[in-house]
Structure formats: C-alpha cells, structure tokens
C-alpha cells in the first residue's frame, strides 16, 4: 500500500445531506470538466487562475485530477488551485469525500491526488478513474454520489 493511502475509519465518515453537489478542478484541457458534465449533478468549478477565489456553502464531494507521479514521486500531485481552494477553512470543512483521476501509466501513483486529499482531509476516497473516464465510470460515480448523499434511486 502506498504511504499516502490511509483507511478512513467508518465511524469518522460524515455523510453529506441535501442535493448531491460536487466541486472540481479541471485545467484548460477540460478532461475533468467533461466528466463532471456527464454526471448531471450541481457543480462548481475551482478557477484555473490562482487569483480567483470561490467559497462554497454546502457539503460536497471534491473531484481532483492528479498532476505528476510515478514511483514514490508525489510532489505536486494535487494542483495548486485545489490547495488554494482548501486553504479556506470553510471550504475544507464542507468536503465530505474525494474522487480523483489520473493516468495508469504512473503505476502505484495512479490518481494519487485522491489518497493524498483523503488522508489530509480525513474523508473517504470514493472512486478513481483514468483520464476522461468511461461510460461505466460515469454510471458508477453517479450511483456512488447519489447513495453517499442518501438519495438512493
């Protein structure tokens, strides 16, 4: 198991209430953005420009792509924009879970931003997908988030 993976104790998990809501970062490539659009949940995008700040006011699941990786190299895996967003305690306190994307070419650091954020925020890592994700990934994530928010179909 990679050193950045931490098992979150089930008793520590705070499940969100209300309407499923996601916050995400996507670079100008828009890979994560395209995935989010397919989910059809309410969402807010973390700005690419570090000078722009946003604040959310409801519980959410954070989607984060992974930058860097390979072997034990994890420095820079979480985009600076996501770190900037989470430096706001109010934003950080409303995060209830994490989903990350990455490239399987990076081996055991595939989508490592998810485990890093899960460990740091003490929230569950709900799912990981590769690059743009597949139709199956979209369906799985829709089910996971719907159930996580207690809105089972």
UniProtKB/Swiss-Prot annotation:
Gene3D superfamilies: 3.40.50.360. InterPro entries: Flavoprotein-like_sf, RNR_Ib_NrdI_bac, RNR_NrdI. One of its GO terms (molecular function) is FMN binding. The lineage of its organism: Bacteria, Bacillati, Mycoplasmatota, Mycoplasmoidales, Mycoplasmoidaceae. Belongs to the NrdI family. Probably involved in ribonucleotide reductase function. PANTHER family: PROTEIN NRDI (PTHR37297:SF1). HAMAP family: NrdI. This is Protein NrdI. Transmembrane segments: none annotated. One of its GO terms (biological process) is protein modification process.
